[in-house]
Amino acid sequence: MRKEVKLGDICNILNGYAFKSKEYVEDGIRIIRITNVQRGNIEDNDPKYYDISKIEELKNYMLKENDLLISLTGNVGRVGLLPKKLLPAGLNQRVGCLRIKDERTVSIEYLYQYFNSYNFERDCINNSKGIAQKNLSTEWLKNYKVSIPNLNEQNRIVNELIKIQRLKKLKEQQLKELNQLIKSQFVEVFGDIHLNDKKWNRNKWRDVLIIKNGKNQKKVESFNGKYPIYGSGGIIGFANDYICNENAVIIGRKGSINKPILVKTKFWNVDTAFGLEPIKEKIKSDYLYYFCYFYNFEKHNKAVTIPSLTKRDLLNIEISVPPITLQNKFSEIVKQIDKQKFEIEKSLKETQELYESLMEKYFG
């Protein structure tokens, strides 16, 4: 049996304090800002602090373990539970804090799962004010209606979702470890590419690969296109024509210049991305990709604001060229690890789909 209640009837909703940046110190009260509230968790990137001696003065804005925090500006509707390790912490302006009034009837973990749903975030976005930047009011939150079952049912739902989330994190960690294994195998087989400690022959890029400029995709873009369209950050659409052949590497011409992508199929690259086609008898695509992964392209950056590379500079990069037999050996290692990754990715996708279906079932 569920009942609909206004959030303000079951929660105290707190607004944050306008901490002054000129009063930041090296350590003390951690300030929880909009940037710390990400989808599903509270991140601790670039921490800012206030003097610990002001803790009594700021007592109305001091946070507690498991406070449910919500972003009220920008990416509105993102929520996370505050972990104990981030205390003592103060609530900054435009971050909301939700505290349960009666824990005998409502679980904060249940509300966290509820508000971590797509439907809640969509409602927040649709009910925000502002054009350039979205702003969500705590008054709207107070009147937001939530569907609450009895406490036992809340706990059952939470436990079910937590199990799936843990399984998802486990699979993500397995993928991370397999990716790290490939990188460590690259170093073990080929050594340090910067030092060339294994004394491989050295060539210029112009001798071992072809750089293909990207082009505007408008004339070839098609919803039913056969070939993926890549920017420097990944797939952005599909096309009925291609520029680069299979087993080529993408690096950014502008923007994301230090994030190479290995593409196994033919593809169209846009004008902000270079396609690198290895000359097969000299260099393998797996080797080229990991060379690019470990290489710092920032040294060739010609721009002040948006990072930018030129084809001329890239063609003059020196690359160690191990024997092709050794490159083939590394490719075989990658192939075997990729098989494991494929199975985990497949299982991860199924786990994610199960999680999304349950979120829709309970909170849709």
Please place each PLM-identified region on the residue numbering.
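Short coil/turn segments at secondary-structure boundaries
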Residues: 20-27, 46, 126-128, 198-201, ...
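A short glycine-rich beta-alpha junction/loop motif
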Residues: 4, 88-96, 106-109, 129-152, ...
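Sequence-specific dsDNA recognition surfaces
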Residues: 6-21, 35-65, 206-246, 263-264, ...
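Periplasmic-binding protein-like
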Residues: 120-123
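A short beta-sheet element
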Residues: 33, 53-116, 231-298, 302-314
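Short, solvent-exposed loop/turn positions at domain surfaces
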Residues: 18-19, 57, 169, 303, ...
